């Protein structure tokens, strides 16, 4: 995941790596042993009473300086050209497209019966349900990763609700309420499926 990447048109990607909180010693130890490329930096989220992913993303947002804000989870394995595709797609989309959602699937579908169930669920969701919602013009409830926003749109809709643990679906509906569309990106990010009950 921490491979040096750049977008199309010669524009560098600035990636902000955020541990869940200052007390996240496991992530801090892993990052201490990792040499980050120049375009990546670590933003440590201070401890607080609310300890959610959306709170951490809201905290990190002011440190991001790009026109496009993307979200990846630590275990994600996006294809090497995914960021290129995001830039090209946003350049070709009208301004009312505020977000691109990549497909998600798993790199360990054969780990257990449970992981196979998750794989079938994601395949159905990203290959059938979301395209059907898009074709009908209905709001797209976003996945929490491999999702990319125009920065100005994200700011306009109020970014993430720090108290909502389904912040991704909430933000997808809020984008629609503000008149923005979500388009689906033909690119699949693999992540780890739960394999133990």
What are these regions (language model features)?
Residues 72-74:
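Active-site acidic Asp-centered loop
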Residues 10-12, 137, 179:
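Glycine-centered short loops/turns at secondary-structure junctions
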Residues 144, 184, 191-196:
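Catalytic cores of eukaryotic secretory-pathway lumenal/extracellular enzymes that build
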Residues 2-49, 90-91:
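Acidic donor-binding segment of Leloir-type glycosyltransferases
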Residues 69:
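Short aromatic/hydrophobic "clamp" motif used to bind/position activated sugar donors
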Residues 35-66, 80-165, 176:
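Long helical/loop segments within the catalytic core of UDP-sugar-dependent glycosyltransferases
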Residues 165-171:
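Acidic donor-binding loop at a coil-to-helix junction in glycosyltransferase catalytic cores
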Residues 172-190:
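Catalytic donor-sugar/metal-binding loop of nucleotide-sugar-dependent glycosyltransferases
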């Amino acid at each position: 995941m921490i491979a040096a990447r750049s977008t199309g048109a010669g524009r560098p990607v600035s990636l902000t790596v955020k541990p869940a909180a200052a007390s996240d010693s496991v992530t801090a130890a892993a990052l201490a042993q990792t040499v980050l490329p120049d375009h990546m930096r670590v933003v440590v989220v201070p401890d607080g009473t609310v300890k959610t992913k959306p709170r951490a993303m809201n905290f990190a947002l002011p440190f991001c300086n790009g026109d496009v804000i993307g979200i990846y989870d630590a275990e994600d394995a996006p294809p090497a050209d995914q960021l290129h595709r995001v830039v090209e797609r946003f350049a070709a989309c009208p301004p009312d497209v505020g977000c691109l959602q990549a497909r998600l699937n798993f790199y360990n579908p054969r780990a257990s019966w449970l992981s196979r169930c998750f794989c079938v669920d994601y395949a159905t969701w990203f290959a059938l349900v979301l395209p059907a919602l898009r074709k009908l013009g209905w709001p797209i409830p976003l996945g929490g990763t491999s999702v990319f926003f125009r920065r100005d749109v994200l700011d306009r809709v109020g970014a993430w609700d720090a108290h909502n643990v389904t912040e991704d679906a909430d933000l997808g509906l809020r984008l629609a309420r503000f008149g923005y569309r979500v388009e689906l990106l033909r690119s699949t990010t693999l992540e780890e499926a739960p394999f133990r009950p």
